[in-house]
From Swiss-Prot:
Highly expressed in brain. Is also found in hemolymph. Keywords: Antibiotic, Antimicrobial, Disulfide bond, Ion channel impairing toxin, Knottin, Signal, Toxin. The presence of a 'disulfide through disulfide knot' structurally defines this protein as a knottin. This is Omega-conotoxin-like protein 1. Disulfide bonds join 24-38, 31-43, 37-50. Residues 1-20 form the signal peptide. The keyword Disulfide bond applies.
Length: 74
């Protein structure tokens, strides 16, 4: 009987951990303001979804990595 109660307690604990709500909205989650989103993301004004903010520096770094050349072509 004690093994059964222990198993039920572990099952309930696991269920609570899995179903616990996150404190901040991840990419694509609904939001009203940027404070609803996790750090590094912001709330898109029209879509009301958390969105990753990509800076020009990050974009150019990835472009250089993909194309193998620096600078803008335009």
């Amino acid at each position: 009987m004690s093994k059964f109660i222990l198993l039920v307690c572990i099952l309930l604990l696991t269920t609570n951990i899995v179903s616990a709500a996150s404190k901040c909205g991840r990419h694509g989650d609904s939001c009203v303001s940027s404070s609803d989103c996790c750090p590094g993301t912001w709330c898109h004004t029209y879509a009301n979804r958390c969105q990753v903010r990509i800076t020009e520096e990050e974009l150019m770094k990835q472009r250089e990595k993909i194309l193998g050349r620096k600078g803008k072509d335009y």
